[in-house]
């Protein structure tokens, strides 16, 4: 049982290999990039997009910045989890730091390129019974529909995350309400 995670349903819908270590381990984890941002690192340099758009950062350079600052996570749940993943999943036994960044990036990248490290294979390898992802009320759930229609037996479900439509101070509140109205008009409830 894992009480929390950062997974994108698109990973399981496409079941494509991850391109590099930054894609599954750094970019989707807001706990990691928040810590790094708090220490003055630019999110775009970490491979994390912003309101201005997606990042064009070089994934290896982003990983190097992460590795050079990994010490900031000492004693945190993120540090414990990542060290477990590095050791048990990727068979890495040296400490992640600036001098080992490229070694980590290369070893992880080589493994991620294999069929055993594709999203659905990892789901099955870890004996996951159900995985819940969080989506906004204005998400069309296309990736979830694709998973359900794929014939794959893995259970990836959506969990409602209403922040954008119930918090008037949320940065996307107005746009989210407009989009929600459009979706309601397009997909009216039947029999209600």
Question: Residue spans of the language-model regions?
Answer:
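Metal-cofactor-binding active-site regions of metalloenzymes
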Residues: 1, 5-192
